[in-house]
Amino acid sequence: MTSNSDGSSTSPVEKPITGDVETNEPTKPIRRLSTPSPEQDQEGDFDEEDDDDKFSVSTSTPTPTITKTKDSSDTSTVTRRKQPIRYIENKTRRHVTFSKRRHGIMKKAYELSVLTGANILLLILANSGLVYTFTTPKLEPVVREDEGKSLIRACINASDTPDATDTSPAQEQSPAN
């Protein structure tokens, strides 16, 4: 604040900061991640002139590959490229990925039950032996009661290959004509 010769005070006018503070040059517009529209080329042209990637900082977790494409109006868009699904060797990274994906699949199960009214029972068995569950209220007794718990234990402890008694023709039912 400054005071005038008549004793009144004035406050400086605040201007919004635009551009680089030190050089006062305008900054580049922010690019947002987006998926290409069906009309755009899915392969995309790589922007050779953009050198923003040379200042990137490496992180402990790998980020998805980002492809820069140009559309007909010369504005560049950034799209994500799908990473191949393979076993994660790093134990810490594997645990973090498991936790995030477990949370994501439970969120999807909840959304599916709310949107469609479906009854859902989701069991996730971790390598550590812990069982994570998501149930809608109607199926909750399957997880909470002793009979349901014993059924879940039997399924978890069962072998991966079907028994010979399970595939006998006498137990198979054919549709009535």
Curated annotation (Swiss-Prot):
Residues 56-67 have a biased composition (Low complexity). Interacts with ARG81 and ARG82. Changing residue 94 to G: Decreases the physical interaction with ARG82. Abolishes the physical interaction with ARG82 and impairs function. This is Arginine metabolism regulation protein I. GO terms for molecular function: cis-regulatory region sequence-specific DNA binding; DNA-binding transcription factor activity, RNA polymerase II-specific; protein dimerization activity; RNA polymerase II cis-regulatory region sequence-specific DNA binding. One of its GO terms (biological process) is regulation of arginine biosynthetic process. One of its GO terms (cellular component) is nucleus. The gene is ARG80. It is found in: Nucleus.
